[in-house]
């Protein structure tokens, strides 16, 4: 019974010791030093907030290293909660007392050598500071934790004890913890100014939600993220991406203008194919114009009107470019789908056309494109955002419903039609091979003629198919890029805490937020602006285009015609043969002319077929 009673007494005593924070600590062998001051950072830290600046305890770090850690801790508090409830003299005293504890020196007749000990800050005040600054215990804790991003000094609950017998002292020397809030301010009770660590920009506000609508992205009530986000990519990388966007937009604009002028104005007779192609080119032209609008206004200035603000629906150039690229992209993808359907129908039924007037296609494409763009325009959706190189739809729901759903439908239809086209090509080629191998002489001629027409028509569809495939893969990338970015949004958002910790520790420009890679952003700009150049290479560099220009008034007038004849004559004289050519050379020349004549006849047949394809399917708009 007595044994149980003593055990109970021992347990209660142990519990009381734990509650009051009794703990034996080893003598670390530190030293007392005078506080060196806050340094030349221009920001006040501990001057006036220490109980005894003439004697602070220094152990395993220099004061400069400790001061750096303290700055990181204060930066963290300011980033997390820059309000007066957190950033105030009381919390500064607590932080300074924790990092630079007062030092006491123990001497005595029995003490072998002087002993230096710290006066720790009480645990309750440490916790109070973290609570008022809303610091989560996953970042820093007053109860210790070796795996936390911010390591805080030890804070006892009430007191600590030391065993000083090896120094000639007592075995239970007690040192009470201190209450830093009782430290005299020494005339330093003025309000503390909150700063922002680079590259964040200071812009105090009482309405972060309202200012977000104006284009300011706050990390707290005092600091905004800079624009463009140098925490995601260095400024030089952003400039390169902007330059890609500007250059490709300008070249694409010039290319599509030439195509519109060639097939819309110089072309003596517009056929059904030309009309559809012109509307498709017009869509690509609009996409190029949106890029040139941004370039003319300054890409960075358009996306970032000021270094601390992103463009929103009150910035006219941003809204105009966003609306135009949205409308034009939808308009182009719709005509792309129509063109692909025509190619499939023409290959399936060799040279036949879908009997729908172009005017009805135009009415449908305009209606759909306007319906999906006027709604976002009316709700103020066109604006720039974090990690963007252009102005587009802000909310994911609008992105999905007014752009990516119709784009996805068109791409799905395009995928199906392309598979069907490939199947028809396979059938034609296989049929041609089979008929040439197994047909009788009488039927073989008819079959061969039919297969020849199919193959010839198929050859005429090479460029339209190349056009369709290039457009398919560029828009497929745009579709997948934004889908992937949206799916990784939480991952990017989670990187904000490590980024803030890095900034708090003074990482500056070396700190990185997760986001789309520079390569993916650059390729996004490339895909969005390159298509006008693709169109020019495919459509302009053809025999038909050369014929249109040769027969146009631009090259057939009193001023230009003599110049062309002179150039032709100069080249003819330069490369003409010598009069004293040998018989062998003459023979070779005759053979060459004969071959040229044959090729000319072959070309004539090809031109006839091409002419039949383009000019026999006239259709009133």
Swiss-Prot record:
Comp. bias (Low complexity): 575-594
Signal peptide residues on this chain, from the entry's feature table: 1-21
Topology Extracellular: residue spans: 22-246, 299-318, 381-400, 486-520
Keywords, ordered alphabetically: Disulfide bond, Glycoprotein, Membrane, Receptor, Signal, Transmembrane, Transmembrane helix
Disulfide feature: 32-103, 46-96
Entry's localization field: Membrane
Sites where a glycan is attached: 60, 107, 163, 176, 206
Cytoplasmic compartment residues: 268-277, 340-359, 422-464, 542-621
PROSITE patterns: G_PROTEIN_RECEP_F2_4
Annotated spans, Disordered: 575-603
Residue ranges annotated for the FZ domain, each copy included: 27-166
GO molecular function, one term: transmembrane signaling receptor activity
The keyword Iron belongs to this UniProt entry's keyword annotation: no
Induction note: Up-regulated by P.aeruginosa, PAO1 strain and down-regulated by P.aeruginosa, PA14 strain infection.
Membrane topology: Multi-pass membrane protein
Transmembrane segments: 247-267, 278-298, 319-339, 360-380, 401-421, 465-485, 521-541
Source organism, top-level taxon: Eukaryota
Gene Ontology cellular component terms for the protein in this record: membrane
A single GO BP: cell surface receptor signaling pathway
Recorded family membership: Belongs to the G-protein coupled receptor Fz/Smo family.
Record-given protein name: Frizzled and smoothened-like protein H
Phylogenetic classification of the source organism: Eukaryota, Amoebozoa, Evosea, Eumycetozoa, Dictyostelia
């Amino acid at each position: 019974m007595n044994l149980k009673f003593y055990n109970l007494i021992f347990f209660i005593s142990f519990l009381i010791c734990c509650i009051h924070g009794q703990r034996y600590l080893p003598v670390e062998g530190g030293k007392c030093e005078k506080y060196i001051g806050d340094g030349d950072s221009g920001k006040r830290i501990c001057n006036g907030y220490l109980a005894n600046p003439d004697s602070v305890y220094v152990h395993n770090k220099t004061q400069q290293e400790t001061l750096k850690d303290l700055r990181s801790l204060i930066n963290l508090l300011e980033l997390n909660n820059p309000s007066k409830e957190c950033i105030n003299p009381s919390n500064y005293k607590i932080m300074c007392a924790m990092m630079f504890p007062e030092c006491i020196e123990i001497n005595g007749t029995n003490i072998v050598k002087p002993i230096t000990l710290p006066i720790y800050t009480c645990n309750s005040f440490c916790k109070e500071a973290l609570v008022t600054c809303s610091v989560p215990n996953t970042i820093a804790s007053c109860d210790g934790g070796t795996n936390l991003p911010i390591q805080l000094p030890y804070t006892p609950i009430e007191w600590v004890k030391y065993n000083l017998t090896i120094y000639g002292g007592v075995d239970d020397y007690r040192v009470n913890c201190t209450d830093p809030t009782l430290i005299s301010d020494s005339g330093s009770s003025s309000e503390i100014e909150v700063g922002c660590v680079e590259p964040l920009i200071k812009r105090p506000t009482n309405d972060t939600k309202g200012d977000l609508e104006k284009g300011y992205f706050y990390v707290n009530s005092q600091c905004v993220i800079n624009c463009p986000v140098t925490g995601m990519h260095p400024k030089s990388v952003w400039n390169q991406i902007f330059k890609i966007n500007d250059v490709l937009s300008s070249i694409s604009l010039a290319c599509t203008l030439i195509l519109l002028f060639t097939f819309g104005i110089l072309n003596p007779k517009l056929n059904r194919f030309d009309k559809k192609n012109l509307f498709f080119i017009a869509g690509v032209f609009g996409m190029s114009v949106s890029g040139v609008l941004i370039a003319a206004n300054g890409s960075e200035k358009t996306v970032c009107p000021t270094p601390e603000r992103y463009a929103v629906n009150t910035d006219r150039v941003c809204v105009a470019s966003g609306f135009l690229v949205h409308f034009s992209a939808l308009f182009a993808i719709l005509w792309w789908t129509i063109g692909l359907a025509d190619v499939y129908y023409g290959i399936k039924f060799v040279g036949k056309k879908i009997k729908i007037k172009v005017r009805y296609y135009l009415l449908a494409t305009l209606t759909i494109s306007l319906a999906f763009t006027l709604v976002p325009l009316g709700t103020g959706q066109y604006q720039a955002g974090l990690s963007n190189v252009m102005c587009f739809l802000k909310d994911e729901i609008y992105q999905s419903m007014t752009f990516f759903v119709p784009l996805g439908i068109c791409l799905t239809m395009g995928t199906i039609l392309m598979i069907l086209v490939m199947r028809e090509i396979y059938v034609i080629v296989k049929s041609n091979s089979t008929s040439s191998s197994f047909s009788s002489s009488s039927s073989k001629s008819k079959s061969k003629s039919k297969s020849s027409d199919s193959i010839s028509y198929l050859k005429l569809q090479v460029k339209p198919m190349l056009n369709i495939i290039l457009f398919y893969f560029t828009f497929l990338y745009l579709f997948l890029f934004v889908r992937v970015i949206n799916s990784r949004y939480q991952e990017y958002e989670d990187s904000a805490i490590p980024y803030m910790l890095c900034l708090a520790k003074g990482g500056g420009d070396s700190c990185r937020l997760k986001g789309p890679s520079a390569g993916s952003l650059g390729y996004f700009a490339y895909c969005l602006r390159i298509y006008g150049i693709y169109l020019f290479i495919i459509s302009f560099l053809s025999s038909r285009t050369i014929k249109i220009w040769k027969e146009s008034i631009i090259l057939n007038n009193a001023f230009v015609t003599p110049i062309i004849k002179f150039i032709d004559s100069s080249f003819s004289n330069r490369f003409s043969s010598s009069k004293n050519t040998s018989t062998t050379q003459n023979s070779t020349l005759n053979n060459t002319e004969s071959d040229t004549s044959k090729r000319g006849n072959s070309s004539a047949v090809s031109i006839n077929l091409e002419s039949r394809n383009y000019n026999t399917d006239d259709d009133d708009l």
